[in-house]
């Protein structure tokens, strides 16, 4: 999918947590309704068959419960995308990435292999650490191959790992430095790799021989291998579609660093100038180049400059999940899955405890027809109504975001205090209360946006009886 990823190491985050976040964006001209569910062991397939390819395989008989954000309609497969399992291990899959003809000539893509549709279902229920996730997915890639190029994130309380596929059967992975964040648009990202450091770097068993055989290392010294040069792309399209997204995230999180939005040398990871919050993650994943000539809603720039770069906060985002694994918390509340549906400049992030058996209907009952009884379609309506007069509605959108996220933090604090006091807490009930609150606030926002948008219609006339 045409997504955007940000990863935040535990020493770079405000609360010592690991954070994995990604927007899932549909292809241009397409919109994919999403829902959030809990997949229990009895609902996990024991023999898996893909819809997009002829791939199939037997799965272990001991899956864990996990959250999932599948396609609501299911006609094209599962596409589980993001989740947390009962061991508080997360997976976000996938970020579609680029490759090059040298790689594809040496290791062609495999039409019968796995893809984004399959990966979370095949891996997340069976792993107890982020590193295990890398190794399980890597083994499947080596055995069955893949028909597309993808980046995948795994995290637990201690670590975040990022895996990128190389051709049909190869892969490479790097552990995110604890004091750094990673920005990854739809482009091969890893720019440094150490074959002699398996604590922080992993890859398919024959990768070094593969590189040597097909002359893929483009560095002069061969002392500091750059996977992005070897396996990635430097296309004109990347300068408009991909690199500007990494640039704008890094500009917000490292304003002291001067960089070119079209540069192919943007670092995969950076140490931020201050610690990163959930709100920061929401902000960068909502970016449309605010206060710049590239902003499609802005007063600066020209009609050409406003369309030159692809915004992160695009119209066709299906869902966004922030997988937030917090340290020094009781295991049942350590993992939080913050969820949003629809276009990011118009929505909010809602926190849910993941060690539950069900998800509130407002987030789980997305259907094909447009409706206001679920979060997905209500957010889609708000975005479509507010877009033509974004600046008029911006204050209402900002207030909604701040108030709902404040309520989310308050809920998390209250539940933790209750548990520390020895009280019993029903986490499904707490999720439901949060959902009910957000449903009310979102309906109020829709009412306001519709009223204002109606008064701004082209056929309005100021004189009345």
Curated annotation (Swiss-Prot):
It comes from the Bacteria. Signal peptide: none annotated. The active site is at residue 3. Its EC number is 3.4.13.19. InterPro entries: C69_dipept_A-like, Peptidase_C69. The keyword Protease applies. One of its GO terms (molecular function) is dipeptidase activity. Keywords: Dipeptidase, Hydrolase, Protease. It catalyses: an L-aminoacyl-L-amino acid + H2O = 2 an L-alpha-amino acid. PANTHER family: LD30995P (PTHR12994:SF17), SECERNIN (PTHR12994). Belongs to the peptidase C69 family. This is Probable dipeptidase A. It comes from Streptococcus pyogenes serotype M6 (strain ATCC BAA-946 / MGAS10394).
